[in-house]
Amino acid sequence: EAGEECDCGAPENPCCDAATCKLRPGAQCAEGLCCDQCRFKGAGKICRRARGDNPDDRCTGQSADCPRNRFH
């Protein structure tokens, strides 16, 4: 939704303020394959294992999303 930084559906989420749908102070992310304990995983961390001839997908260190490698 517009203006939301995170999914405010779960009040127990330690990264997201359920009342405002904003990240809590100090949090970089609230969910995603490249989010761990409210912080972006480091660049190069595997977020999706290789399948077939495609290599592993790896976090960028700048986002909670797991980017698809260029071979997909």
UniProtKB/Swiss-Prot annotation:
Limits of the Disintegrin domain: 1-72
Matching entries from Pfam families are given as: Disintegrin
- Distribution of this protein across tissues and organs: Expressed by the venom gland.
Predominant location category: secreted
Q: Which UniProt keywords apply?
A: Cell adhesion impairing toxin, Disulfide bond, Hemostasis impairing toxin, Platelet aggregation inhibiting toxin, Secreted, Toxin
| Motif segment (Cell attachment site) | 51-53
Q: Which Gene3D superfamilies match?
A: Disintegrin domain (4.10.70.10)
Which SMART domains does this UniProt record tie to the protein? DISIN
Q: Map out region (Disordered) in residue numbers.
A: 51-72
Where in or outside the cell is it found?
Secreted
Range of residues in the leader sequence: none
Q: Which InterPro entries does this one have?
A: Disintegrin_CS, Disintegrin_dom, Disintegrin_dom_sf
Q: GO CC annotation: what is one?
A: plasma membrane
GO terms for molecular function, please? toxin activity
**Which superkingdom?**
Eukaryota
Q: List the disulfide bonds.
A: 6-21, 8-16, 15-38, 29-35, 34-59, 47-66
The family annotation for this protein states: Belongs to the venom metalloproteinase (M12B) family. P-II subfamily. P-IIa sub-subfamily.
Summary of subunit composition and partner proteins: Monomer.
Additional remark text: The disintegrin belongs to the medium disintegrin subfamily.
Q: Give the function comment from the record.
A: Inhibits fibrinogen interaction with platelets. Acts by binding to alpha-IIb/beta-3 (ITGA2B/ITGB3) on the platelet surface and inhibits aggregation induced by ADP, thrombin, platelet-activating factor and collagen.
Kindly provide the name given to this protein in its UniProt entry: Disintegrin cotiarin
Q: Which organism is it from?
A: Bothrops cotiara (Cotiara)
